[in-house]
């Protein structure tokens, strides 16, 4: 049994045994094929019926991939599991574009952050903290909030000349990268689609 996500390369499914059953559990930004609770329930139900269950996710399951939540559910049901780490898109996509996230001369720190902040921290505090924190920010799920993110970062101290890259379809043959600065990337963002 393979429960797979939207962001995996579908060609990898061809390596599964012909008898494998596949379940799509992807989450589009505007539509979830299954609520997370249903995915969790399916993993537990299939495992308790004696099936070997693979939860196949793109990137690293513990970096904005709900892998921690899913592992917790399995542990709470005493279901043994193994985590196979992946390479998060915040590392893979910039590398594929030839952009290092750290560089001895420019950036000695990097943070992986989400534009969908549910930590309870005030939005202004969150972006002020990031504006004055690590040199490199890899922002996940931020396309729809790009103008607001750029405004908040510059408002709280990041230079409008800070280099920015937008990467679409990272590490695929359709990857597209647009570069600019915090001050002009919003105007260039239309080039990504």
Stretch-by-stretch model annotation:
Residues 5-7, 115, 169:
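Cofactor-binding loop segments of dinucleotide-utilizing enzymes, especially the Rossmann-like FAD-
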Residues 13-14, 45, 102-103, 128-130, ...:
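Short secondary-structure boundary/capping segments
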Residues 58-133, 176-184:
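Class I SAM-dependent methyltransferase SAM-binding "motif I" and its flanking Rossmann-like core
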Residues 12, 74, 93-94, 149, ...:
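Hydrophobic packing residues within well-ordered alpha-helices of enzyme cores
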Residues 1-87, 186-187:
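Class I S-adenosyl-L-methionine
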Residues 38, 48-54, 109, 117-193:
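A contiguous loop/helix-start segment that scaffolds small-molecule binding in enzyme catalytic cores
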């Amino acid at each position: 049994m393979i429960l797979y996500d939207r962001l995996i390369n579908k060609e990898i499914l061809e390596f599964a045994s012909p008898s494998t059953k596949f379940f799509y559990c992807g989450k589009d930004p505007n539509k979830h094929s299954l609520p997370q609770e249903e995915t969790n329930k399916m993993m537990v139900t299939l495992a308790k019926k004696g099936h070997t269950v693979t939860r196949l996710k793109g990137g690293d399951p513990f970096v904005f991939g709900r892998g921690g939540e899913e592992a917790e559910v399995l542990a709470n049901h005493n279901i043994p599991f193994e985590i196979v780490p992946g390479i998060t898109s915040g590392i893979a996509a910039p590398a594929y574009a030839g952009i290092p996230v750290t560089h001895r001369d420019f950036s000695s720190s990097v943070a992986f952050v989400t534009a969908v902040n549910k930590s309870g921290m005030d939005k202004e505090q969150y972006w002020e903290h990031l504006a004055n924190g690590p040199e490199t920010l890899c922002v996940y799920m931020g396309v729809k909030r790009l103008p607001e993110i750029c405004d908040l970062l510059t408002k709280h101290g990041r230079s409008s000349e800070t280099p920015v890259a937008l990467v679409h379809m990272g590490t695929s043959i359709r990857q597209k990268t647009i570069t600019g600065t915090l001050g002009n990337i919003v105007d260039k963002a239309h080039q990504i689609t």
